[in-house]
Structure formats: C-alpha cells, structure tokens
C-alpha cells in the first residue's frame, strides 16, 4: 500500500501473509496484559503497570501490522509498530491515541534504559485507559478485514 511505502523502502516492514488465528492470539495476549496491568497497579506498582499497558499497546499494534500482511523487522520493531499505527489511525481522536502510544514507547524506553523517571498512579491509569482504547480500535479494524467473520442475517 502506498501509505506504507516509506516503511517498505527502508526495510522496516516486509510483506508476509499472516493468518487471522495468529492475530487473534496476539490480541488476546494484549487483553491479558491490560488485565495484568490493572492487577499490578492495584498492588501499588505504577511502573510495572505502565510497562504492561505499553506492552498491550505494542501487541495490539503488531496485530494491526499483521492484518495488512506485513511483519516489522526485529531491530527497532517497537518504533516501527508505533509509526505504522500512526499511518493507519488517521482520524482526529485516533491520531491522539497513536501519539500517546509513541509517547509511552519513549517513556518505557527511558524506564528500562534511563534513570530518574517515575510513573505516578495517575499516569499508569491513563496508560491502561489508552491501551484499552487502542486495543478496542484495532480489534474493530482487524475484525472488518477478517474473511471468516460471521455473516449478518
């Protein structure tokens, strides 16, 4: 597709047919990460909760990439997925969600490799909410593309 040409030309994504069964499994794992994020937050671990909420967004984003019959290359895959999501989600509210995902990617990177960043309970709750919204949006997009979806009679 033309909107992905830059990612294709740079070698960031490659064409690969991926079935809907795998996409459903990745989406289910994303949903589990959101549930785990809530549990960890209730236990007082805001940073762990934030990281799991980000993981849920990453998994949902990967499923979205798969739904267009692409796979991100391994090196830099988190950024590639975030960039791909930005290209697909293009209405006003969805763009905000895609940018939240990218901001969370950068924060999570700093949590893992940097020092001094603390995540508050409010930030973790917002991350969970954003992860849930992104997952729901991506589930709708993927379901619309599913050739096996139920016929409405």
Please describe what each predicted stretch is.
Residues 1-153:
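Terminal alpha-helical segments
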């Amino acid at each position: 597709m033309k909107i992905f040409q830059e990612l294709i030309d740079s070698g960031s994504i490659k064409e690969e047919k991926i079935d809907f069964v795998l996409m459903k499994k990745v989406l289910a794992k994303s949903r589990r990460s959101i549930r785990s994020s809530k549990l960890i937050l209730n236990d007082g671990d805001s940073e762990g909760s934030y990281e799991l909420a980000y993981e849920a967004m990453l998994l949902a984003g990967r499923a979205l990439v798969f739904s267009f019959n692409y796979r991100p290359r391994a090196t830099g895959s988190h950024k590639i997925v975030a960039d791909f999501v930005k290209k697909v989600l293009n209405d006003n509210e969805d763009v905000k969600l895609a940018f939240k995902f990218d901001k969370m990617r950068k924060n999570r990177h700093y949590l893992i490799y940097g020092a001094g960043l603390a995540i508050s309970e409010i930030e973790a709750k917002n991350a969970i909410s954003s992860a849930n919204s992104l997952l729901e949006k991506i589930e709708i997009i993927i379901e619309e593309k599913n050739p096996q979806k139920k016929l409405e009679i």
